[in-house]
């Protein structure tokens, strides 16, 4: 009963439950069915009475009353007349809310083309009629006639006629022999008369017959649109409008400002324009005005409607009174300020506040301090309810008064209300899910929010004036989710890499580090203590210090929980820390009996979390935070100017390097080296000098010194302590303070040759200061730009991955990826253990020696397994991956593996796609904000030698070496590798060695760790001969293909190959060097080709004609790019390039087949390379290579599939096509990881795999079979598999396709959900396409559901959806049973009853 009464005042329509949304083109009948009346006048409201004009844009008769339950003239007021239509003013008495829902319409006097279907590319009307957009516009805007019915005349259908031609045709054939129309009517006729089935059939025939690719593409486009119309039930002529809908007036409001003026929505202006022109056109037609006037008016009407729908899409932008373009209906949806992103995906919420944050070290981890004033305001409704319940007030008004007066009982009640009611804290920018966490509020005085210091890392917050927002979860479910999922105590691990994120930083680290220092010769050294009591006593009486070496007894428990103890060599400081460790058999004293750097603290917390669980970890973290602060305060570590030590040897090192650079200068002057080489060498020398000075400085800082008087160890250097502990500062910064600042980079990324020799302690000279401003400014400018770029990258990633949700436990996939350790320049940068931890094993992992099973197939690999795997030295493991998961919607839990933020197998409903996107995007922003801290100091990344990273035996793979005239071994092979094997013959390291490297070892040699294996010149690439003989030049003509450049400063000449194609005389030269024997015959190479070496532009000749050379001698050199500094700047665009799957600028060319290289006939500036296959069944493949590119293959070389013909970054599409999905995945994962690794950012591979999975969702049809697709169509992979399964069952021919790689933007726009795509980018295009195809959005992803305002299908929402589905299925079963037993009437009644319940 109560419910009914309440509903009288606010009749709420039952919420519709729906499962999908469809979009299609509105027919005129549909528009009329929405409309409540025609708008005939352009007036809005009467400016004196402020009442809407009748039949105007705000008419109350059409749209509904202005005030609730009150007609316009005031005859009927109040509820009792509800639903009556006033006979005087014609207004229905109802809620004024209907003015937000009721639409009107305008009957157009002439049809008008809908600009979206006309101008949104590709033009739908154009494609359908097979006419160009220009021609259609000519007809629409009354320039040309179009023949719609040629009759028996010589005119063709769709032929355009100008005014004169039309007149001539009328004279020639007579007016009734043919039909030619002009304007939108003409297009309407053409569209209405189309027989789509027939056209589709014809197009299919044409497609089968055509041979040219271009024609095929065109026909396919047209066929696709025709099919879309046929399938969706849209009619083509609906793209021409005869009726324009008018949106409800409250969505385009007119607001009175003070001073009698009005602020209005632009739409009203645009509608007014349409109505004015339409009425004028009606009048002109009635008056039978001359055709030319009517035509002009029709054209203006078309333009007015165009501007209303999409202003500025065609012609001039229509501007308002203040020269500002008017916002049309399309602009309301588009962009960041449009409906989708402003109001549907991002809403402002109530019950929120924001304030500055201050640190709250005495809080527990799950608490935050909330100012009383804020809490009182935020929790008002709860307080009113509690005041009422406790009988302090009987009405809300009284309660309000009590709260306003801030009576004592109010504060008591506030305490009760707040207890155990979590609030959400958020710091913008929210880059990952840890940017919003829940805390229990404690009330504090003052106006600032107190934040626990340990969560600062997660929020990326500091206390220099940052602000944070507070939100109150209201419903019980919201509070529950906040507590169970978002509480800060539940977010101990970082979702990107599974490492703890609740880690002490800065002061706390310094305090803990200070505690753990060991010092020699302290008082009380060697004492033994039985328990902490004795130790405390000794400390307080200064018998021992915190750093004394002592023996102490550490008490813990064994596996059964019985107390055990053990004596350790340790220090009192470490014993104090050990006291805080949870008592657990797996947490030995050893983890805190070491120097407590930030890394070790992080490891310790991780260890505690893995073995003792979450609760213990949280308590432990809080305790070590307190301890850290206390001791940082007691230690009083600070530093002064004298703590920055300048090494004595600095002057000597600088002098030596200056001497070196002068020598290089001299060599350059003597012409021994080129300008580029000199630059590289100078830069190198200074780089090494800087490193050397830094080493000396660090050695001085680390040095342990003793006080000659007391004999005790002097206090460690404070700066060193801060840096070494990881509290603040890096070696790089210390170098700039006390060593030398080193080389600086120009804004272009090049390094300035003259370094900054001074450091900040000595002070910079004016010139040095000026040189250093470059880098510093570039850093600041970059930061601003890159923050935006990074944010955009994250947005694209989220958009492409938003529907990757864990939807089942196991998909049963039998394919996966092979994981191997990542080796870079001989260093293992990611061990196999790190890579497979928390993943599911695909095959059983066996011990290589004993053969026993370490991990069974289908089990998740845990920490304990990783230890065994690493010890066993296993080098490759097959694991399940999201990339190869076969789940239909989403990913399965087995393929994903461990939920990194919890350390347990991932739960169903986890939105792994969004987590992946945030994990990749968040460090992007972090890094971009971090560039300028280096102050532009250059870091050169180039190595010139290779050292053994292990002891072992050398094995050469693809061995191809010769001894040159100096007796050195020289590598002649393109893909030779040096392997180092351990005693058991297992590969420990693999190094690629480049062509032309000098080898110091040979097959079977043993090497020690750190021994030089090979070296090469990193700045030039050699061209070497592999036969002994005499050099002769071919086509090396002075002035044409070779120039002798004399260096201005030195007068020494060197001979360089120049671009010979620039002159007509030199166009067919092929500059080369040939090696002949004494008789003058050209020698043969081992692979059968002539010993002719083609030279590319910029090669520097190293020998004279006629010189005698031995195998392995360098005959020419190619300069390489000079070393540019690497910085995430190169990084962020690189990541974007990889995710967008763009072809890199100078991309590598990859061999598609195995075979032999042959040179074909060259083009003008391309070189033709043909690969002759080893297998006769395959066609040879040819490649065209730009001639200027450094090219290293010779005629007759053997090449394998997947090898590079031309070096560079390979295009991901090529890798996919040639080597397949797994190779592509490992390439993308490694390349992206490389960029982040340079910055020291850890991201788990699985995140990148999830994104790559989303990029590989489509296949391109190659064989259509009976699928009904056309070759070249892009289809969802899973869709094709399902259709094929069905076809095979029916005994028909299945289709096949190749996987295509789509960039993330493209993939987001191609999601099955048009709502999600429209809210991402190119809104108009997406909606136009969806409407033509009559697309259905099944609301599978997260974004669509947020937009329509439902629970997202992840997490809680995912489970409720599942439960709802099961329930509906069961209900249907029950009703079926009822139907069988008791007849349909009862069952139907039950159905109605159920739907009503569901609606309530």
From Swiss-Prot:
Annotated family: Belongs to the RNA polymerase beta' chain family.
Q: Which GO terms label this protein's molecular function in UniProt?
A: DNA binding; DNA-directed RNA polymerase activity; magnesium ion binding; zinc ion binding
Q: Give the catalytic activity.
A: RNA(n) + a ribonucleoside 5'-triphosphate = RNA(n+1) + diphosphate
Annotated Mg(2+) binding lies at: 462, 464, 466
Indicate whether Nucleotidyltransferase appears among the record's keywords. yes
Q: Which cofactor does it need?
A: Mg(2+); Zn(2+)
Q: Which GO terms describe its cellular component?
A: DNA-directed RNA polymerase complex
Free-text function comment from the UniProt entry? DNA-dependent RNA polymerase catalyzes the transcription of DNA into RNA using the four ribonucleoside triphosphates as substrates.
EC category name:
transferase
On cofactor binding, the record's note says:
Binds 1 Mg(2+) ion per subunit.
Q: What is this protein called?
A: DNA-directed RNA polymerase subunit beta'
Residues reported to bind Zn(2+) 1: 71, 73, 86, 89
Superkingdom, taxonomy of origin = Bacteria
Name of the gene: rpoC
Q: Does the keyword Transferase apply?
A: yes
InterPro entries named in the record: DNA-dir_RpoC_beta_prime (IPR045867), DNA-dir_RpoC_beta_prime_bact (IPR012754), RNA_pol_asu (IPR000722), RNA_pol_N (IPR006592), RNA_pol_Rpb1_1 (IPR007080), RNA_pol_Rpb1_3 (IPR007066), RNA_pol_Rpb1_3_sf (IPR042102), RNA_pol_Rpb1_4 (IPR007083)
Q: Which SMART domains match?
A: RPOLA_N
Q: Provide this UniProt record's keywords sorted from A to Z.
A: DNA-directed RNA polymerase, Magnesium, Metal-binding, Nucleotidyltransferase, Transcription, Transferase, Zinc
Subunit and interaction comment: The RNAP catalytic core consists of 2 alpha, 1 beta, 1 beta' and 1 omega subunit. When a sigma factor is associated with the core the holoenzyme is formed, which can initiate transcription.
């Amino acid at each position: 009963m109560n419910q009914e009464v309440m509903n009288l005042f606010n009749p709420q329509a039952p919420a519709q439950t729906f499962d999908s949304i469809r979009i299609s083109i509105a027919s005129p009948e549909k528009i009329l069915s929405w409309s409540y009346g025609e708008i005939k006048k352009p007036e809005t409201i009467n400016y004196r009475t402020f009442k809407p004009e009748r039949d105007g844009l705000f008419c109350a008769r059409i749209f509904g009353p202005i005030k609730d339950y009150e007609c316009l003239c005031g005859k009927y007021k109040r509820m009792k007349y509800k639903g009556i239509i006033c006979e005087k003013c014609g207004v229905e008495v109802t809620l004024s809310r209907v003015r937000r829902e009721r639409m009107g319409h305008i009957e157009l006097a002439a049809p008008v083309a809908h600009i979206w279907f006309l101008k949104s590319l590709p033009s739908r009307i154009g494609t359908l009629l097979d006419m160009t957009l220009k021609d259609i516009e000519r007809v629409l805007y009354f320039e040309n006639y179009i023949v719609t019915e040629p009759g028996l005349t010589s005119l063709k259908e769709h032929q355009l006629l100008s005014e004169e031609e039309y007149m001539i045709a009328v004279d020639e054939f007579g007016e009734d022999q043919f039909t030619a129309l002009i304007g939108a009517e003409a297009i309407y006729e053409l569209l209405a008369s189309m027989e789509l089935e027939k056209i589709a059939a014809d197009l299919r025939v044409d497609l089968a017959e055509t041979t040219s690719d271009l024609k095929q593409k065109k026909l396919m486009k047209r066929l696709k649109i025709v099919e879309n119309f046929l399938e969706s039930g849209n009619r083509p002529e609906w793209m021409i409008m005869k009726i324009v809908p008018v949106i409800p007036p409250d969505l385009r409001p007119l607001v009175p400002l003070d001073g009698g003026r009005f602020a209005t929505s632009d739409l009203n202006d645009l509608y007014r324009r349409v109505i004015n022109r339409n009425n004028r056109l009606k009048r002109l037609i009635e008056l039978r005005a001359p055709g030319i006037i009517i035509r002009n008016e029709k054209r203006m009407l078309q333009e007015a409607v165009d501007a209303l729908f999409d202003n500025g899409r065609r012609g001039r932008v229509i501007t308002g009174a203040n020269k500002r373009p008017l916002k049309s209906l399309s602009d309301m949806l588009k962009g960041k300020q449009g409906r989708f992103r402003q109001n549907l995906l991002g809403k402002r919420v109530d019950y929120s506040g924001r304030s500055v944050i201050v640190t709250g070290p005495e809080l527990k981890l799950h608490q935050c301090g909330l100012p009383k004033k804020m809490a009182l305001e935020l929790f008002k409704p709860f307080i009113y309810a509690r005041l009422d319940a406790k009988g302090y007030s009987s009405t809300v008004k009284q309660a309000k008064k009590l709260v306003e007066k801030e009576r004592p009982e109010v504060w008591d009640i506030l305490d009760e209300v707040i207890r155990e009611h979590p609030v959400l804290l958020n710091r913008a920018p929210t880059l990952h899910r840890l940017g919003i966490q829940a805390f229990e509020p404690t009330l504090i005085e003052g106006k600032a929010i107190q934040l626990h210091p340990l969560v600062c890392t997660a929020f990326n917050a500091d206390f220099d004036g940052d602000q944070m927002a507070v939100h109150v979860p209201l419903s019980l479910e919201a509070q529950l989710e906040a507590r169970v999922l978002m509480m800060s105590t539940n977010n101990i691990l970082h979702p990107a890499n599974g490492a703890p994120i609740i880690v002490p930083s800065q002061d706390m680290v310094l305090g803990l580090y200070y505690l753990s220092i060991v010092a020699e010769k302290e008082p009380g050294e060697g004492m033994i203590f039985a328990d902490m009591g004795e130790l405390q006593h000794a400390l307080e009486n200064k018998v021992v210090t915190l750093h004394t070496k002592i023996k102490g007894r550490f008490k813990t428990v064994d596996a059964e929980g019985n107390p055990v103890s053990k004596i350790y060599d340790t220090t009192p400081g470490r014993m104090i820390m050990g006291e805080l460790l949870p008592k657990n058999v797996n947490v030995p004293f050893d983890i805190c009996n070491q120097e407590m750097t930030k890394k070790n603290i992080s490891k310790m917390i991780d260890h505690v979390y893995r073995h003792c669980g979450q609760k213990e970890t949280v308590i432990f973290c809080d305790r070590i935070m307190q301890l850290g602060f206390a001791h940082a305060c007691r230690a009083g570590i600070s530093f002064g100017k004298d703590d920055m030590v300048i090494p004595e040897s600095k002057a000597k090192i600088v002098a030596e390097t200056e001497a070196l650079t002068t020598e290089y200068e001299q060599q350059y002057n003597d012409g021994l080296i080129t300008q580029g080489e000199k630059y590289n060498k100078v830069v190198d020398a200074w780089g090494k000098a800087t490193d050397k000075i830094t080493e000396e400085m660090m050695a001085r800082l680390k040095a342990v010194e003793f006080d000659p008087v007391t004999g005790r160890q002097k206090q460690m250097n404070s700066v060193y302590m801060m840096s070494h502990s990881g509290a603040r500062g890096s070696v790089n910064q210390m170098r700039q303070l006390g060593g030398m600042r080193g080389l600086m980079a120009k804004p272009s990324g090049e390094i300035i040759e003259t370094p900054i020799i001074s450091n900040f302690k000595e002070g910079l000279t004016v010139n040095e200061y000026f040189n250093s401003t470059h880098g510093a400014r570039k850093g600041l400018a970059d930061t601003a730009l890159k923050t935006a770029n990074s944010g955009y990258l994250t947005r694209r990633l989220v958009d492409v991955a938003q529907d990757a949700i864990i939807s089942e436990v196991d998909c049963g996939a039998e394919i996966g990826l092979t994981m191997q350790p990542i080796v870079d320049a001989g260093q293992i940068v990611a061990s196999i253990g790190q890579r497979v931890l928390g993943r599911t094993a695909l095959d059983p992992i066996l011990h290589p020696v004993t053969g026993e099973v370490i991990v069974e197939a289908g089990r998740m690999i845990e920490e304990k397994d990783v230890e065994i795997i690493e010890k066993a030295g296993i080098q490759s493991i097959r694991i399940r991956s999201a990339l190869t998961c076969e789940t239909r919607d989403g990913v399965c839990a087995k393929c994903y593996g461990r939920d990194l933020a919890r350390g347990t197998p991932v739960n169903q409903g986890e939105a792994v796609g969004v987590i992946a996107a945030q994990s990749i995007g968040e460090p992007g922003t972090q890094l971009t904000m971090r560039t300028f801290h280096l102050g532009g100091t250059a870091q050169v990344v180039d190595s010139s030698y290779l050292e053994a990273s292990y002891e072992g035996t050398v094995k050469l793979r693809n061995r191809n070496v010769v001894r040159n005239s100096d007796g050195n071994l020289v590598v002649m092979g393109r893909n030779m590798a040096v392997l180092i094997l351990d005693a058991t013959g297992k590969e420990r390291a693999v190094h690629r060695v480049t062509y032309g490297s000098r080898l110091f070892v040979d097959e079977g040699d043993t090497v020690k760790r750190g021994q030089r294996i090979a070296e090469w010149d990193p700045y030039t690439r050699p061209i070497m001969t592999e036969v002994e003989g005499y050099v002769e030049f071919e086509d090396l003509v002075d002035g044409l293909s070779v120039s002798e450049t004399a260096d201005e400063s030195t007068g020494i000449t060197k001979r360089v190959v120049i671009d010979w194609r620039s002159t007509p005389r030199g166009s067919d030269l092929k500059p080369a060097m040939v090696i002949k024997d004494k008789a003058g015959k050209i020698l043969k190479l081992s692979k059968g080709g002539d010993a002719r070496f083609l030279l590319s532009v910029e090669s520097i000749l190293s020998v004279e004609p006629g010189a005698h050379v031995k195998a392995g001698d360098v005959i020419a050199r190619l300069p390489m790019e000079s070393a540019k500094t690497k910085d995430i700047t190169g990084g962020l665009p690189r990541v974007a390039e990889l995710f967008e799957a763009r072809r890199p600028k100078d991309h590598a060319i990859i061999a598609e087949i195995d075979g032999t290289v042959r040179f074909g006939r060259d083009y003008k500036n391309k070189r033709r390379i043909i690969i002759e296959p080893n297998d006769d069944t395959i066609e040879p493949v040819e490649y065209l290579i730009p001639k200027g590119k450094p090219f290293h293959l010779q005629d007759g070389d053997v090449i394998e599939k997947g090898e590079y013909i031309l070096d560079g970054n390979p295009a991901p599409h090529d890798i996919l096509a040639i080597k397949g999905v797994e190779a592509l995945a490992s390439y993308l994962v490694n390349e992206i990881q490389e960029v982040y690794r340079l910055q020291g950012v850890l991201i788990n591979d699985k995140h990148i795999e999830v994104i790559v999975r989303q990029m590989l969702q489509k296949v391109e049809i190659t064989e259509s079979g009976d699928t009904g697709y056309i070759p070249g169509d892009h289809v969802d992979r899973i869709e094709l598999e399902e259709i094929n399964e069905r076809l095979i069952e029916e005994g028909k021919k299945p289709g096949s396709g190749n996987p295509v790689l789509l960039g993330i933007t493209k993939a987001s726009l191609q999601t099955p959900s048009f709502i999600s795509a429209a809210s991402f980018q190119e809104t108009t295009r997406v909606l136009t396409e969806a409407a033509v195809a009559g697309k259905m959005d099944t609301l599978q992803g997260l974004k669509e559901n947020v937009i329509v305002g439902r629970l997202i299908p992840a997490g809680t929402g995912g489970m409720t959806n599942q439960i709802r589905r099961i329930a509906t299925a069961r209900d249907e079963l029950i009703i079926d049973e009822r139907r069988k037993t008791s007849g349909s009437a009862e069952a139907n009644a039950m159905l109605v009853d159920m739907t009503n319940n569901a609606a309530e």
